[in-house]
Each structure stands twice: as structure tokens, then as C-alpha cells.
Amino acid sequence: MNMFSSLSLVTLLLLTMPIMMMSLNTYKPSNYPLYVKTAISYAFITSMIPTMMFIHSGQELIISNWHWLTIQTLKLSLSFKMDYFSMMFTPVALFVTWSIMEFSMWYMHSDPNINKFFKYLLLFLITMLILVTANNLFQLFIGWEGVGIMSFLLIGWWYGRADANTAALQAVLYNRIGDIGFILAMAWFLTNLNTWDLQQIFMLNPSDSNMPLIGLALAATGKSAQFGLHPWLPSAMEGPTPVSALLHSSTMVVAGIFLLIRFYPLTENNKFIQSITLCLGAITTLFTAMCALTQNDIKKIIAFSTSSQLGLMMVTIGINQPYLAFLHICTHAFFKAMLFMCSGSIIHSLNDEQDIRKMGGLFKAMPFTTTALIVGSLALTGMPFLTGFYSKDLIIEAANTSYTNAWALLMTLIATSFTAIYSTRIIFFALLGQPRFPTLVSINENNPLLINSIKRLLIGSLFAGYIISNNIPPTTIPQMTMPYYLKTTALIVTILGFILALEISNMTKNLKYHYPSNAFKFSTLLGYFPTIMHRLAPYMNLSMSQKSASSLLDLIWLEAILPKTISLAQMKASTLVTNQKGLIKLYFLSFLITILISMMLFNFHE
């Protein structure tokens, strides 16, 4: 056990070496990206040893080695929880990040601030590992906020672009809403249970835990881009491609799902929270899959597919299968990072062209990248015996055999079928057919940094699912709950659907083009959500505040109440006064004339 804890800490310490080198200025600036990549590769190899020990023994460990603070009866100490989730996730995160770092050395080689970029990526990984290994809520919150601020810095890396700044701000603001939920949960646990340690919270297991769990669900909604707080995730594509790959594979977006998985001892008997996560996940996975169907930006399609997969993980938590959701996090990291890296390779080769309508015919021009892209797309759809199949098939089976909430599960099944549509669409538009890009574009994928990084993830996308699913406890084969013919039906329906799609495509490709339907507009404009939330709501707020400011302050207070009220009173007094002109001679004359006329009339009557 001593070796287990020591090597686990060495893994984390190895990652801090390049940052200390940068602080002490003991490095050659041109070699810094190589130092970072090497440190992560060594950390991955080191992390495999305690992971293998854990798989062999199944013994969890809590390392608590530095007491930090005591507030009355609350003890805060630096403690690491080396359990099933952290031990399985750490090697996956390190392996994927190692490949992304190598890819970044090729992709960002001309950037003048490449050393700072690598430092940011490394800090991003470290904060995620702090979040994963944290044993108390305070330490978890440090990692939680760490991935938030690093995502802001990395999405807005090209700060000269207005879109990048807007996207970075969006990411922060949407996550702030989620953080309110996290802080609410922390406050509730502190006031009611007087502890932030996870094992104590699980041991006390409060019966009325709806309030903190709603807070944690809100936090997961913000961080994992569930419906309502989802627009920041496709906008995050404004950052460099390595950032998109790291953000969407093994770091920030899975942090929210990971938080709910961490708290599964509280959620497993709470039907209310399970219903919330199930419905939220179902809406998210269907909505984002619909949005992905008509997008033309290659990175946006992959981003929406990430959001759809996060919704699927949320559904899995909702049907009380946290271990299955965690398995999907681990398998999803490999092919999602590879998909982003392949799209980055294509974008780089086509002079920053991201529109799939302007690609085509890349299968012969970039054979390796396109092979990896096809394998990644097939793994995403859950093609048998690729990595995605080992988790996705089990999720669909668990959903089909679940007795809860039929409409949510039906939405999930429709969304998973949409996955096949947008994955095939990328392959069809970007890789097949005639080239639709300018003839003078120089396509080159012969860089070892690019080839090796994608190759490593390609092997992961082919075999990681099998390796992970055969090594995680329990290793016994579960009993099949679904009839055999239903399992084979899925494969038959897939083949029939493919043949039918080809036939319909051949039949309709020469038909006259019609004006886009409402469903097409709904999908293309992302369900009108950004238009309403980012335009209409701020416009209404601004116009209301402007009217209230101008009406309440200017028209009412500064005009109606004080000056106008006083002026009206004074005007009445002044008109009363100015009615008398002060012409005494005229008054006397009029008085005299009146007397004379009256006397004359009196005398006349006599």
C-alpha cells in the first residue's frame, strides 16, 4: 500500500515539474513543449502501476498528509481519494492529454506564445486531476474553479478575435450559474452535517438531501453543458483545436458528470434527483443531436456530438447506473479527442477551412487522417467491437430494460440514432465525393508529431474499450437481461437503415430544391435558443432598465415631482398676481364711469 500511495502522488508531482521549471527559469524556451509532453508521458506510465495494483487488489486508499485549517469543529486537510473512479480515470486523462500535447507541438508551432499555451494546457490537466482525486468538497471546488478559469484562458487564446472573447465570456458566465448550485450544496453540507469530507457525508447519508443534490445537479448542468446552460459548449470551438480536444474529451465537460457520479451514494435512493437527471439528460441528448444534424462547421458538429454524449451520460445516472456512465466517460475520451485532432489536421491542411461543404475527396489526399476520422465516427456511433460499443451498447440495453419514464428513454434512443446520421454526414461531405476546395491548397500530413499522436488515439479507439471493460471490477460476465433476438435486431435494423438511406439518397438527389422546412431552420438556428437568450432577453432587460431609468429618474423625479410641481404652484400664484396690473388711474376711471352711468340712469327714471 505504501508503494501504491507513493506512486499515486509521484504521478501528480511529475506534472508540476514543468511549471516549477518555468517559475525558476531553468529551461531552454525552445524545448519547453517537449518537457511538458515528456512529463505527461512519464506520469501516464507511472500512473499505470498503482492502477494495475488497484485492479489486482481492489483496495481503495485515502491519502491525507497535510492538515490545513481548523474552523471550530470543521477540519480541512489536503486529502486524496484513490478509489475506483480516480484510479481508472487518471491514466485515461494522462494518455489522451499526452497525445493532445504532441499534436499541439505540430498545430501551434508558429504561435509566439507556445510555451504559455503548454503551461495553460498542463494546468488544465492538473486542476482536473485535483477535482478527480479530491476527498473533500473544498479541494474538489478548487479543481472545479481551476478547470473553469483555465477554460476561459484557453478558449480566449486568440484574444484578437471578438468571437473568441465572446465565447470565453460565455463559458465563464454559464459556469457561474452552475457554481451557485455547487456553493449552495457546500453550504448545506456544512450547516447540516458539519463536514465536507466525502466519506463522512456518505456515512451520515441525510434523508432530506434534495436541496444539496439539486445544487449539485445545477452545477453539473453548467459544467457539463446540459440543456438550458448548453450554448457555451459549441461556442468554445473558437479556441484552438487542441483546446477543443482537451476540453471535450477528458477534462472540463465531464467534470459535471463526474461530480454526480462521485455523489452516487446519495442519489441511488433518491428518485426525485434521478428523475431530474434522467429528463434533463434526455432533453439535452435529443436537442443537441438535432442541432448537429444540419451544422456545416466540422468542429461544431463534433462539439454538438459531445453535448449529446454528455446528455447520454446524464440519462445513465438517471437510470441509476453511475459506473456505466463512468465507463462511457473513459471510452468517450479516446475517440472524441481523436475526432477533434483529425478535424484540426484537415482544417490546417485546407488553410483554416472549417465548412464541410468546401471539403470532399480527402480520402485519397489525406489517407491516414481520414481513416482515423472514420474509425472515430464509427466508435462514436457504437459500432460493434470498437471502443464506444462497450459502453454505449450497455447504456442502450440498460435504458431498454429500465422501467422508468418511457418518454425520456424514447428520446434517448432517437438521439442515439441521430448520432449515426451526423457521423455519416461528416464522412460523406468531408471525405468522399469530388474535391470542393481550391486546387492550390498544399495538403500535407507527413509530420511525425501529427501521425504519432493520432495513431496512439486510434489504437485507443480500437482496443481501449475492450481492455477497460475486461479489467474493471467486477470482471465476471453479467447475465444477459435482453433476449438474444433483440440484440441481433439492432444490427439488422442498422444494415436495413443504411441500405434504405442509400436508396432514398439516390432517389432524391436529382429532385428540385425546396425552401428549407421549419424543422431544418429549427436545427440550423440551434432551436432559436441563442437568438432568444442572447438577444431577446438582454434586449428586454436593457430596454426595461433604460425606460425605468429615463422615466423614473428623468420624467418622474427630475421633472414631475420636484421642478414641475413647484413650477405649477408658482405659475398659479403668479397668474393670480399678474391678473392685477396695478393701473390705479384706469381703475378709478372705470369706477367713476360706473358711478356716473348709474346716477344718470337713476336721474332719468325720476
UniProtKB/Swiss-Prot annotation:
GO terms for molecular function: NADH dehydrogenase (ubiquinone) activity. It is an enzyme of class 7 (translocase). It comes from the Eukaryota. The chain crosses the membrane at residues 4-24, 43-63, 87-107, 117-137, 140-160, 171-191, 213-233, 241-261, 272-292, 310-330, 366-386, 413-433, 457-477, 482-502, 582-602. It catalyses: a ubiquinone + NADH + 5 H(+)(in) = a ubiquinol + NAD(+) + 4 H(+)(out). One of its GO terms (cellular component) is mitochondrial inner membrane. InterPro entries: NADH_DH_su5_C, NADHpl_OxRdtase_5_subgr, ND/Mrp_TM, NU5C-like, Proton_antipo_N. It is a multi-pass membrane protein. Keywords: Electron transport, Membrane, Mitochondrion, Mitochondrion inner membrane, NAD, Respiratory chain, Translocase, Transmembrane, Transmembrane helix, Transport, Ubiquinone. It is found in: Mitochondrion inner membrane. One of its GO terms (biological process) is mitochondrial respiratory chain complex I assembly. Its EC number is 7.1.1.2. Core subunit of the mitochondrial membrane respiratory chain NADH dehydrogenase (Complex I) which catalyzes electron transfer from NADH through the respiratory chain, using ubiquinone as an electron acceptor. Essential for the catalytic activity and assembly of complex I. Core subunit of respiratory chain NADH dehydrogenase (Complex I) which is composed of 45 different subunits. This is NADH-ubiquinone oxidoreductase chain 5. It comes from Bos indicus.
